[in-house]
Amino acid sequence: MHGRYFPELMVTRAEKFIKQNRKHPFLLYVGFNIPHYPEQPLPEHAKLYEGMEEPRKLYASFITTTDYYVGRVMAQLEKYGLTEDTIVLFLSDNGHSVENYVIEKDNHSSGYPKGYDYGSNGGGGNTGKWIGNKGTFLEGGIRTPAILSWPGRVAKGETRGAVVSALDWLPTLCELAGVAQPDAKLDGHSILPIIDSSDAVSKHKALYFQWQEKWAVREADWKLIYMPDDGGKLSLHNLGDEKPEVHDYVSEKPEVVTRLKGLYDTWAADVFAPRP
């Protein structure tokens, strides 16, 4: 029995939604499962990169497939004359993946023995000078695209250098839609001033990251990262370095470590429920 390609199902439904709701304001969230592994591009896109070496070959093919489906959503907006006054956001949740998995038990359902290496579930990404990847708090793992299309208000090709977070989009969209924000405390800020002007600055005095026991806090160009391995380790980096996050300043800047650790402790006490 052949399965059905999930991106095709999702975009077909998105196209239908746009058609059905084209005559009044709408919010559409299209949560693509691509280019997340398993990397399964459309055959016609895989053929475009036959002369390229792996893992770049497979990743390039898959990115082209992603681009194709994003293009279909955009084409549907254009078809019904909605492009000019529709805000389109393209976001990602983490950097490129270099994960691989090994079977850790006997009698695995796949039939393969314990210790069998499935191989890489990704690869091929490139983050330039920013080292790191998915699963790390290095910039290569958390600095992700934020692409906005809004022809009626934002000119093509403009860029912004201010730091923003995915947390900022809810208050931003609430402001644009004239909707009252939730009564609950929000960590995000409206970035409408940044959208409108390249001179606007970020309202974030610090950014916080946490995954299980790992955490990081960033203030301006300083970033403190805690890894629980080997009894716990702190590393301090300056994002303004020529080679960011390569040099560790922990021993050189103890006062910065103390200040950033204090910021994290205050944030964690506010966010996390007390442990029993």
Where are these regions (language model features)?
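The substrate-binding groove and active-site-proximal loops of carbohydrate-active enzymes
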Residues: 1-8, 51-65
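Non-transmembrane alpha-helical segments in soluble domains
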Residues: 11, 15-19, 60, 67-70, ...
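Active-site His/acidic residue clusters
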Residues: 12-59, 97-104
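Loop/turn elements at helix/coil->beta-strand transitions in domains of secreted/extracellular proteins
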Residues: 22-28, 82-88, 144, 202-204, ...
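Beta-strand elements within well-structured catalytic alpha/beta cores of enzymes
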Residues: 26-31, 63, 70, 77, ...
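Short, solvent-exposed turn/loop segments enriched in Gly/Ser/Thr/Pro and often Arg
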Residues: 29-40, 90-98, 187-188, 209-212, ...
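Histidine-centered active-site microenvironments of extracellular/periplasmic hydrolases
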Residues: 38-41, 78-152
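C-terminal cap/loop subdomain of S1 sulfatases and analogous C-terminal strand-loop tails that border
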Residues: 108-139, 153-240, 255, 267-274
